[in-house]
Every structure is written in structure tokens, then in C-alpha cells.
Amino acid sequence: MAKAVTVKIKLVSTADTGYFYVTKKNSRTQTEKLSFKKYDPVARKHVEFKEAKIK
């Protein structure tokens, strides 16, 4: 059986609120860590979210 190309990752808020998004990424084409500006409802503003592993 082949190894899965897409991997589930967690985008964690840099505002230290504990809020996170779960998304998928293609590990072959996107080798660098993802970083997005998304809405954090706990902080009630747009902040940067950085990639972390799902445990």
C-alpha cells in the first residue's frame, strides 16, 4: 500500500489563545511550513497562524 501524499496539519494561532484550524497539505509540493493570516474568534481579530503537527 502506498504512502499518503496529503497530510493533516494543525494551524495554531500566534496570539496564544489556543485556537487552531485543521487542514491538509501536499507534502511533496509544499515542503516549507505553512503560515496564514486568518481570523481568531477568541482574540476577535486576524492573526498569523503557523503550522504544527497533529498529535
From Swiss-Prot:
Single GO cellular component term: cytosolic large ribosomal subunit
Any one Pfam family match given in the protein's UniProt record, by short name: Ribosomal_L33
Keywords per UniProt: Ribonucleoprotein, Ribosomal protein
Gene3D superfamilies the record matches: Ribosomal protein L33
UniProt xrefs under InterPro entries: Ribosomal_bL33, Ribosomal_bL33_CS, Ribosomal_bL33_sf, Ribosomal_zn-bd
Gene Ontology terms, MF aspect: structural constituent of ribosome
GO biological process: translation
Family: Belongs to the bacterial ribosomal protein bL33 family.
Protein name in the entry: Large ribosomal subunit protein bL33
Organismal lineage: Bacteria, Pseudomonadati, Pseudomonadota, Alphaproteobacteria, Hyphomicrobiales
